[in-house]
């Protein structure tokens, strides 16, 4: 199973996080499948690769609670519902 979660980078006492798609069994600093974003909590900066995030969400990736809040604030889930079409 794949999750979208935060991977810690940066210096001591100055954390910066990458938002990555990673296997659920991997460690926090383990090998990721793809880097899909960036989050700096101190400067409150966020960069998201929305097409890559939508790709992983459509394939069944589960975001963690913190990543879910970041994506919700950026409006990614509204784009996800607009991209889904009903097949009859």
From Swiss-Prot:
The keyword Ribosomal protein applies. GO terms for molecular function: structural constituent of ribosome. It is found in: Plastid, Chloroplast. It holds the Pfam family Ribosomal_S16. Keywords: Chloroplast, Plastid, Ribonucleoprotein, Ribosomal protein. It comes from Gossypium hirsutum (Upland cotton). It comes from the Eukaryota. This is Small ribosomal subunit protein bS16c. Belongs to the bacterial ribosomal protein bS16 family. One of its GO terms (biological process) is translation. GO terms for cellular component: chloroplast; small ribosomal subunit.
């Amino acid at each position: 199973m794949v999750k979208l979660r935060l991977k810690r980078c940066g210096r001591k006492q100055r954390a910066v996080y990458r938002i990555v798609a990673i296997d659920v069994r991997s460690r926090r600093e383990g090998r990721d499948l793809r880097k899909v974003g960036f989050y700096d909590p101190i400067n409150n900066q966020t960069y998201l690769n929305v097409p890559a995030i939508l790709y992983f969400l459509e394939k069944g990736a589960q975001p963690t609670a913190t990543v879910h809040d970041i994506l919700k604030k950026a409006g990614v889930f509204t784009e996800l519902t607009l991209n889904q079409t009903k097949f009859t």
